């Protein structure tokens, strides 16, 4: 039966492409279905770069995952003989008692991670072009940096295909059903069957998994690129760091100048609700752009305003802004990644590996209980789920 597989994956973005690779590496017959073209710009994983860091202010329980993620990214680089991770270091700036500083220091202390306190007197010399506000302190995480987001996905796709995975693009899933030990996936043109399923549908998770009543909402987020006032300002070749600021106006982050697009910067906080991910407004949000401009004037004075390029991506948020990595309540042969809440791509390697383990083995090599869906009071957890889900 040519449409029978060991594992089917819904979604082939960052996490889905990694899952396809790690499933194929295990020798499984794997099919991945993606609603758009390969390495597209209509979801959450595009825009040149993504931050990767280990002293995780969000929660120290992420650190074991991050250590494995780093190892897997390095293995992928070795396999393809290409650099994907740029260890620029990360300068983090915020109030002494703020969420950022307290969280970073806690994770670094608990997991013995390198984290340098930057004295005010040395900040300007060490990080030219950056401003340390009077009410803030700074730390530097030397083993942090950024990933080339599209290149990571492109190479996971390519390596999965080289190992025999069947990856199909422009194939939105229209429905799925479970009959005894078999899962049937329906697209516009075909039906596919497998005993195991991974769902990594990004902003479409609530559509694909509507039976679970996941507590998710999607936000529209903006990425901006700016020219710089001098050719050497904030340049990757000049060892400029990746950066993250906590300010009274929210969280802002950015990257060294990587290419002709200029310096990329974005506001991590905020965002506007998306009702339909297929119809997201991709125009510039003028009010949000003004906030980014104000941040740059105050903290990166060698950036030339206005911005010259812009892109929109989506965050799929949970109520507590932590991931959902779990098995389906009724069908444990279905593994789910959802609600990565705007900080998930750095984990794509390890989440892909873990989802395959969860679907095939029923357990993961790294503890993920703190990301269980059971922490939420979901309708499906209270009353059970239907055995069929048809999508419009």
Predicted regions and their residues:
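Flavin (FAD/FMN) cofactor-binding core of flavoprotein oxidoreductases
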Residues: 121-125, 146, 219, 286-364, ...
